[in-house]
């Protein structure tokens, strides 16, 4: 051990130094509990490089020499008091907070004193500048006055000096001006900083950032756009007129519809809404700005404020095609539109098949036409003719009328072996009402019983005089099956078209007439239209009736899609919003907004018309209440709009005073679930014309046991419905009077009944027949003969001129002088 102590040491021995200052803190809790916690303050360890000596401790800096005039803010803070030895952490925190608050208050007081001193200095400088400016202005005024006096003296000098040519120059004084820009101080005055209070508020308003310091107006309320406009307008008025006089009132042309709100009217007039409300209050009308007023009240307000009114009605929203007339120089020739009309089964469709080289009649139910067909045929001369094939059945009167209204020429087909029939006469009336020329085509001339001359003579009864009888109506004998006379017919059609000079403008937005409309299962609503003017293109926006849409596809009569269709061309249009009515006008408009606007207006008008109550009287109401008319409810669904119209018209024609048809719903397209539900709730049958129910509707039909009636020929439908309605009424009762008698005496018969002694005046009276007892030609009772006796013997009948006694069933109201009428009742099957 001693050897170890004697060895020289090259390194210091390892040991622990005290690197922290330790202490204790006493914690006090509730209920007298305390706790002592050891607290250590760790000192930062300094690492030295090998061979480097630690830096000596910094000596306290010597106190600087006092400045000659130290600023108050440059004073050194007072030395901090040393912390007490036995100070707790809570006391230390409180002491530090108190010292920080005192320091903050002291700094704030120093800043306030600096601001006061700066503001005082600025005020002194401003006062000094104002005095200098005032002095400079006074000197300038004195100089101007001296110059004016010198100029006046020069003018008043004697003229002799002027003759000598030696005019003495006016002495001019140059007074130095103190400030070359006297208005500069005013500019500085405008840029003066806010007052002391404002600066103080800004300083205390929140944290000061660099952006806030650069943008002094940050946070202030910005001037509104209206206020800025008013300020600029005022400045412009002051510059222009030099006065703040009110400007002249501007008179406006105010467009006023049938109903308008007060606020909207104020905007259009350029007035304040409150002024209009005050004026209405003066007129004893308590309204608000958002309240609607009528056109007459708006007119009073517009005139009161000195404006001009322009009245417009809601009808102006609708399209008025009559007002849009094309200039004469824009019109170009167009193909004629020819409608083939005549009685059913006179060969109209067969004639069109012969012209087109097709066979349409084979595909038609019952061999009759029930839709309007539209086709275009090329002639030998290179022209085109558009044909419309109309139904000849009586139920399709509206279709024939539509065909006559859109056509240029009517070809009246009359069968040479049948003659002039009811629908032939109706077609003549439609043609005359439409005011279009007519060509008579006498068909079936190949039959041996054909008599064309008889047809011409029969047409004279209806004021149709053909050319062979020295008239002006062209006629031609044809045979559709043998295809004879067809070329002559086409020549006559072209000749008539040349006389009419048919023209239309192709380079404009299209207008067309709906010939037929239907709801196709795969293509949706489809309308067959005839272009009257313009060109219909794919993508055009249009409105038709109460529906609007966009042309999705244009299909010609051969089933091919085309890009556009010109005047007199029949096409199918896809892309409608709904099924339009046949005969509606299709008009192409600028955009979808315009189309929707017109369609909505028309829908509102249609709803008003549908829901409007018809004018009635008390007599009509009481008659309806007392009448025992039976209603036969029914739903009608068909493939096209024209068939729906024809079926509804035919059903109403079947109705009479005892029973009438009530059509609950009539529409186009397949039978749907809603149709079946409505029929089940109303206990009504569904008539399907060339349509069938879908899968879900068939399930509902089976579940609710709804009666379905399917037809494809219209006269089969009307016959069946007539039988159904007759069955609802029951058999028809036919009364036959067999005898009459007069009551001579009345006797008692048993305890309750009365017997009447009769004298038979006419016919015979039989036991068990129906009888009517009348008194003064008024029926007292209608009953039957319960008992018939003659001289106390029961008999079956009593003939005229004999006396008898009768007992009537369920009546004792018999008096001498009454009359008895005996009759038989026969029940027959009722027909409508």
Curated annotation (Swiss-Prot):
| Domain tr-type G: residue ranges | 333-503
| Listed Basic and acidic residues bias regions | 89-144, 180-200
Q: Where in the cell is it found?
A: Cytoplasm
One Pfam family per UniProt: IF2_assoc
CC per GO annotation = cytosol
Q: Where is this region: Disordered?
A: 1-249
Annotated region G2: the residues are: 367-371
> Which GO MF terms are attached to this record?
GTP binding; GTPase activity; translation initiation factor activity
Region G5, annotated ranges = 479-481
Keywords tagged on the record: Cytoplasm, GTP-binding, Initiation factor, Nucleotide-binding, Protein biosynthesis
Q: Where is this region: G3?
A: 389-392
- UniProt-annotated stretches for the region G4: 443-446
Bias-annotated ranges (Pro residues): 53-71
* Stated role: One of the essential components for the initiation of protein synthesis. Protects formylmethionyl-tRNA from spontaneous hydrolysis and promotes its binding to the 30S ribosomal subunits. Also involved in the hydrolysis of GTP during the formation of the 70S ribosomal complex.
HAMAP family cross-referenced by the UniProt entry: IF_2_B
PANTHER family tied to this protein? TR-TYPE G DOMAIN-CONTAINING PROTEIN, TRANSLATION INITIATION FACTOR IF-2-RELATED
Family per UniProt? Belongs to the TRAFAC class translation factor GTPase superfamily. Classic translation factor GTPase family. IF-2 subfamily.
| Name of the protein | Translation initiation factor IF-2
Species whose genome carries this gene? Erythrobacter litoralis (strain HTCC2594)
Record gene name: infB
């Amino acid at each position: 051990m001693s050897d170890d102590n004697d060895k020289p040491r090259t390194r210091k021995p390892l040991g622990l130094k005290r690197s922290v200052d330790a202490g204790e803190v006493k914690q006090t809790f509730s209920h007298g509990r305390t706790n002592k916690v050891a607290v250590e303050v760790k000192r930062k360890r300094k690492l030295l490089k090998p061979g480097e000596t630690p830096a000596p401790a910094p000596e306290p800096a010597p106190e600087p020499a006092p400045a000659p005039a130290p600023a108050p803010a440059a004073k050194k803070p007072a030395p901090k008091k040393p912390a007490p030895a036995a100070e707790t952490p809570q006391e230390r925190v409180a002491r530090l907070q108190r010292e920080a608050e005192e320091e903050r208050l002291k700094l704030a007081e120093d800043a306030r004193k600096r601001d006061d001193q700066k503001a005082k200095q600025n005020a002194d400088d401003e006062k000094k500048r104002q005095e200098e400016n005032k002095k400079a202005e006074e000197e300038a005024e004195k100089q101007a006055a001296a110059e004016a006096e010198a100029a006046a003296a020069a003018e008043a000098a004697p003229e002799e000096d002027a003759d000598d040519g030696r005019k003495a120059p006016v002495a001019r004084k140059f007074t130095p001006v103190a400030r070359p820009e006297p208005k500069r101080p005013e500019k500085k005055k405008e840029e003066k900083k806010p007052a002391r209070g404002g600066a103080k508020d800004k300083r205390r308003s929140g944290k000061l950032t660099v952006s806030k310091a650069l943008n002094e107006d940050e946070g202030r309320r910005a001037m509104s756009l209206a206020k800025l406009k008013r300020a600029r307008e005022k400045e412009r008025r002051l510059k222009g007129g030099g006065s703040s006089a009110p400007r002249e009132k501007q008179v406006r042309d105010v467009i006023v519809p049938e109903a308008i709100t007060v606020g909207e009217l104020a905007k259009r007039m350029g007035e304040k809404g409150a002024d209009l409300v005050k004026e209405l209050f003066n007129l004893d009308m308590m309204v608000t700005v958002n309240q609607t007023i009528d056109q007459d009240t708006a007119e009073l307000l517009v005139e009161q404020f000195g404006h001009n009114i322009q009245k417009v009605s809601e009808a102006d929203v609708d399209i008025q095609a009559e007002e849009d007339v094309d200039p004469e120089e824009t019109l170009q020739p167009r193909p004629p539109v020819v409608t083939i009309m005549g009685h059913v089964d006179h060969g109209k469709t067969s004639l069109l098949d012969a012209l087109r080289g097709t066979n349409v009649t084979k595909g038609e139910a019952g061999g009759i036409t029930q839709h309007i067909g539209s086709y275009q045929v090329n002639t030998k001369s290179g022209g085109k003719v558009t044909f419309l094939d109309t139904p000849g059945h009586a139920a399709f009167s509206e279709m024939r009328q539509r065909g006559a209204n859109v056509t240029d020429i009517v070809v009246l087909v009359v069968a040479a072996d049948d003659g002039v029939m009811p629908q032939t006469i109706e077609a003549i009336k439609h043609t005359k009402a439409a005011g279009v020329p007519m060509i008579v085509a006498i068909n079936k001339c190949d039959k041996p019983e054909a008599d064309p001359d008889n047809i011409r003579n029969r047409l004279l009864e209806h004021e149709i005089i053909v050319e062979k009888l020295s008239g002006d109506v062209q006629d031609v004998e044809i045979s559709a099956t043998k295809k004879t006379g067809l070329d002559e017919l086409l020549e006559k059609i072209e000749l008539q078209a040349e006389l009419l000079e048919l023209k239309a403008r192709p380079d404009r937005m299209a207008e067309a007439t709906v010939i037929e409309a239907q709801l196709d299962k795969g293509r949706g609503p489809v309308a067959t239209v005839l272009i009257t003017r313009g060109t219909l293109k794919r993508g055009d926006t249009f409105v038709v009736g109460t529906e609007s849409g966009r042309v999705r596809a244009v299909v010609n009569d051969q089933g091919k899609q085309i890009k556009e269709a010109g005047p007199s061309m029949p096409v199918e249009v896809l892309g409608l919003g709904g099924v339009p009515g046949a005969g509606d006008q299709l008009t192409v408009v600028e955009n979808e907004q315009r189309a929707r606007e017109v369609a909505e207006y028309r829908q509102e008008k249609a709803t008003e018309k549908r829901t409007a109550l018809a004018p009635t009287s008390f007599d009509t109401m009481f008659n309806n209440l007392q009448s025992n008319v039976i209603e036969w409810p029914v739903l009608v669904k068909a493939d096209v709009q024209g068939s729906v119209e024809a079926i509804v018209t035919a059903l109403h024609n079947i109705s009479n005073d005892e029973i009438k048809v009530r059509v609950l719903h009539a529409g186009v397209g397949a039978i749907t679930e809603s149709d079946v539900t409505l029929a089940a709730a109303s206990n009504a049958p569904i008539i399907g014309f060339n349509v069938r129910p879908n899968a879900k509707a068939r399930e509902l039909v089976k579940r609710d046991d709804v009666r379905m009636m399917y037809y494809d020929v219209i006269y089969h439908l009307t016959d069946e419905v007539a039988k159904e309605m007759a069955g609802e009424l029951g058999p028809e009762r036919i009364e036959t009077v067999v005898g009459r008698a007069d009551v001579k005496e009345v006797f008692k018969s048993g305890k309750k009944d009365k017997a009447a002694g009769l004298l038979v005046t006419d016919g015979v009276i039989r036991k068990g027949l129906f009888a009517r007892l009348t008194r003064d030609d008024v029926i007292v009772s209608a009953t039957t003969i319960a008992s018939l006796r003659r001289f106390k013997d029961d008999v079956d009948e009593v003939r005229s001129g004999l006396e008898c006694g009768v007992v009537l069933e369920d009546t004792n109201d018999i008096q001498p002088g009454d009359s008895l009428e005996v009759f038989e009742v026969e029940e027959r099957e009722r027909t409508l």
